[in-house]
Amino acid sequence: AAKPTATYAMQMVETALAGEFGERCFRNCDVVDMTFACVGAVDALHNSMDFVRANPNKKAIVIASDYAKYELASTGEYTQGGGSVAFLISSDAKLLEIENKIGVATESVFDFFKPRREIGKSSVTGLPETFADKVEIFTDEPVFDGQYSNQCYQDRIKEAYTHYKEESGNVKPYENWRFLIFHLPYAFHGKRLFTEIFGIENGMNTA
């Protein structure tokens, strides 16, 4: 989009704080949108942490907001929903500290996408137009393959976990973890994911 949605959030907070800090109190703050399905907020978090590491006297705010909408009666319908959360990133953290070691895994797959097509108006109407010579067709409901998407997610988690082990030098890092947080499109997805990793780490048959 030409206008980042982050500017709307900034404007609302700026207006709320105007009485205390004056009008346009955020005039020297930078804002940017990062959009990438479910992981956009994580990417924004990583970028903000890098910014704060390079500028320890500054802070960053990550606002994550998303909704999932599926066709009625589709297999994805019961996973739909929406939510939002905000993080304040600081070099002097009060609640949570994030180490500078992460595992990443990426692959170009086609398990989930929102189709967008352009069709020439003359192909539809048979008549020439003096403006906007194309018709854009877009659906807000995705085309997806649920089981394939599950497998892609599982494979990336394993690859990211392996990468984290290499980066951290920790043979079994999960042994020092008290809690695990997963993106959960539906109940028990996280348990299914980590059960396989736990089995592999302990020589169990996960086939």
Segments from the language model and where they lie:
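Accessory "access/gating" subregions that flank catalytic or transport cores
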Residues: E175-A207
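Short coil/turn connectors at secondary-structure junctions
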Residues: F26-D30, N55-A60, G82-S84, D92-K94, ...
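Phosphate/pyrophosphate-binding loops at sites that engage ATP/ADP/AMP, CoA/4′-phosphopantetheine
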Residues: K158-R178, E196-G199
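Conserved active-site and cofactor/substrate-binding residues in soluble primary-metabolism enzymes
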Residues: P4, Y8, V39, D43, ...
